[in-house]
Amino acid sequence: MKKTFLAMAFMLLLIVPSTILYASAQTSQSYTLTGAGSTFIFPLMDTWRVQYNNLHSNIKLNYQSIGSGAGIKLLTQKTVDFAASDAPLQPSEQAAAPGTVTIPESIGGITISYNLPGIDKGMKLTGPVIAQIFMGNITMWNDPAIANLNPGMNLPAQKILIAHRADGSGTTYAFTDYLSKVSPQWKTAVGQGKVVPWPVGTGAQGNAGVAGIVKSTPYACGYVELAYAYQNNMTYAFVQNADGSAFVEPTIASVAADAAAAATSLPAPDGDWSKVSIVNQPGSNSYPISTLTYIFVYKDMSQISGETQDKSQEVKNFLTWIIHDGQQYASPLLYVPLPSAMATADDQAISEIQFGGSAVPEFGPIAALVLAIAIVSIIAVSAKTGLRITPKL
C-alpha cells in the first residue's frame, strides 16, 4: 500500500509541473483576434474588447467598424477571424463564404431620430408615414399626415432633411425590411437591402455618420441605432406597433418584447438565415424596428490567413464569453441580452468550429505534448514499481 501511494505521489509530481509550465506558456502567448463589420454593434463590441482584455491581458481584439457589407467582404476574402452584421447572410453571400456558421450576439433597436428645435422626443409616427417621409412624398414637418398624429405639437413649416447610410449597412437592411413590411409602395419602388436606391436624402458612413448629420442639422431626420441615439442625446419618434394599438418608445424592454415574439425558432447554425426577421412583431409593448445582430465565422478556421490552431481556440473562447458573461454589458448600452435559448443555440454553433477538419481542442499542441510526456512517465513508473494502472475486470 505504501509502495502504491509513493508511486502515485511521484506521478503527480511529474504531471503537475508540466501542467503549470503549459498554463504559463499559454498565458504568455499573445494573440490579436480580428473582426470587422457592423457599426450598429460597435459600442457593445468595443466594451467587450476592453473587458475581455482586462480578464485576458494576452488577448487583444482589433475590430474594424466599417459596416456590415464591408465586414462580410473581408470574411469572404478570409482576412479576418469573424464578421459582424445586423443582417443575416444572403444566399449569394453564403455561396461566397461557404462553411460559415451564424451566431446571434445581441439584439438592438433602430430609432427614427430627428432634430426639431423646441420639440422633445415622442413625436408619433406610423410605419406608412415613415415610409412616405423616406420616399420623399412627405417633405414638410407640418404635413397633415404628421400633424394629424401629433395634435397640439407645434410642427415647423420646414423641409424634412433626410440622412441615410451611404455604405453597405445591416442597419439599412433591418430598416428597409421594416419599411417593406409596412408599405407595399416602398417594397415595390425601393425594396430591402444593405444598399438601396434612396429616393431622397444625404448619405453618411456608419451609424455615427448619420447620427452626426441629424445632431448637427436642424430639421434633419434619420434612422439611428438606439445606443447611438442615447449616447448623442438625440430626440426620436415613438413608432406605432404592429397591432396599431399604441405608439411605442424604443427602449430595452420594448425591443426585447419585439424579439421575444420572433426568436422562438431559428435555423441551424450553418443553415439559411436569409429570411430571419424580428421587425414589426405583434404585441402591444413591442417596438417594431428591431434586429438581431450576428457574428459569422468559418467552421474550418484553418482557411483564414495567418490562423493557427491555438488562435482558433482563442476565437472560440472569446465568442463563448460574449454570448454568456459578456451579455451583462448589453443592457447598460441599450442592447437586449440574448435569451437563454438563443445562447444555447450559439454554444452549438461554436462547438462546430474546427481547424483543418478537426475539432479545435480545449488545449493546443503544447498540452498534447505535456499529456504525452505524462503518460509515458506514468507507464515508466508503473513498470518500475509494479503499480497496476489498468482497471481490474
Protein language model regions, located:
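Secretory targeting signatures
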Residues: 1-27, 358-393
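Flexible loop/hinge segments at secondary-structure junctions
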Residues: 23-359
